[in-house]
Amino acid sequence: MSKTNNRRSSNWYGKMDKDGFIHRSWMKSQGLPDHVFDGRPIIGICNTWSELTPCNAGLRNLAEGVKRGVWEAGGVPLEFPVMSLGETQMKPTAMLFRNLLSMDVEESIRAYGIDGVVLLGG
């Protein structure tokens, strides 16, 4: 963590204060080793996968491939869910919730300490 950079994630994971310690500790509790917090970019993978949404069924496997690619490129992938809208399953229509989905995605990106994002949606 001796590297200094201007990445957004460094405000979460790169600081050597109490907040930085807490952020790193929570992520390490998920099995991430110490060395991933050395200034690498944190890449969010926003996924609308759901068993209720048939058109998004393939996104679960696709997200795993994206994670491998992010690791191979030197980043740290962190997947996060957002609401999934399935036109064939929602009544009266999924159209009523599209703005809410947009807000869900935008605010999740804004709220988390990520440097980039891959959006997966059907």
Predicted regions mapped to residue ranges:
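Metallocofactor- and cofactor-centric catalytic cores in central/energy metabolism, strongly enriched
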Residues: 1-122
